[in-house]
Amino acid sequence: MNLFRLCVANLVALFWVVIPTAMGANIIPQPSYIQEKQGTFDLAHNNNILYVGKQPEVNQIIDNFMEQMLGDYGLSLQTNKSKKAGILLQDKKSLGEEAYELSVAANKVVIKASTPAGFFYALRTVNQLILADENHTSLPCILVKDAPRFSYQIGRAHV
């Protein structure tokens, strides 16, 4: 009987991991909410980023993201002061400390967070979505909402 329970528990654990991956967006860690939509956002032609907010640390996070996109994928992104920017980052004070909302539509990406950490995690999610694209130039249209499940980080061994 114990062997049967162990087998059932292993099957449940396997499906718990495999089913979300087979359903589409594979974002690690799994966000609190994902809604996939039809279409893609083309980063090669919508390469302007605009931050509308008052947190200077976010500008450094954006600069690091742009350097990574150029180095990893050859995508040249630029900051822009125009509201017509393809990627728009906005402060949203009602979100938690590290929470974010990422909305990707065919014509615009909107990222909302209340802290630099939230913007950082949102841009890490964007990077994972770019990795999923064969040519590394587009994002799937998607809505992602996430907040940390725990208010602390587990210690890590730095090697």
Task: Outline where the language-model segments fall.
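N-terminal secretory signal peptides that target proteins for export/translocation
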Residues: 1-5
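Bacterial N-terminal signal peptides
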Residues: 7-20
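Contiguous, structured surface segment used for ligand recognition
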Residues: 24-152
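Conserved small/polar residues in nucleotide/adenosyl-binding loops
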Residues: 157-159
